[in-house]
Amino acid sequence: MTELHALRDAYRSDKAALLAAMKATGASTRGIRVLLRKLSSLAGNLLQTLWQRAQLPDDMALVAVGGFGRDQLFPYSDVDVLLLLPDGTAPEAGSALRTKLEGFIGSCWDTGLEIGSSVRTVAECLAESAGDVTVQTSLLESRLVCGNAALFAEFQRQYRAQTVSYTHLTLPTTPYV
């Protein structure tokens, strides 16, 4: 637990320093954009450390979604992440995978990251986004934080194909490239 406390203290200190610098300079719009990217980077670096510490399987990916996916983390916003699993993976209760996932999410909270997390396969992401526009929008603004880049690329390919197809069916007069 000592390592988590050290990570928490470093995260809090670095975040406080960024916010203090912004307040001291009376940041302009451009300055605020830089701050949002720096806060996003700070959270992303901590997530990468926690991901490695959790020793999650190599076939998984940690994906930033929503504002965090845009690389714009507002000072008091939660950090929205998707723990992306390959299709056919089900973290059953009591399984080693589920234990590792719960440990990773718990470590995030223990270090001061207020995360909003979902654990889904690519197929589950597609199904959820087809039925919920908030999920669809959140996934639209996604980027890989760490983990399996090929899985993330496959998710993006399928998600974009579904989203463009759905949008075109809904708005048939809209031109698409």
Task: Cite the ranges covered by each PLM segment.
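N-terminal regions immediately upstream of nucleotidyltransferase
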Residues: 1-58, 76
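Single conserved hydrophobic/aromatic residue that forms the stacking wall/gate
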Residues: 168-177
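Long, hydrophobic, amphipathic alpha-helical segments used as structural scaffolds
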Residues: 26, 50-58, 112-119, 163-166
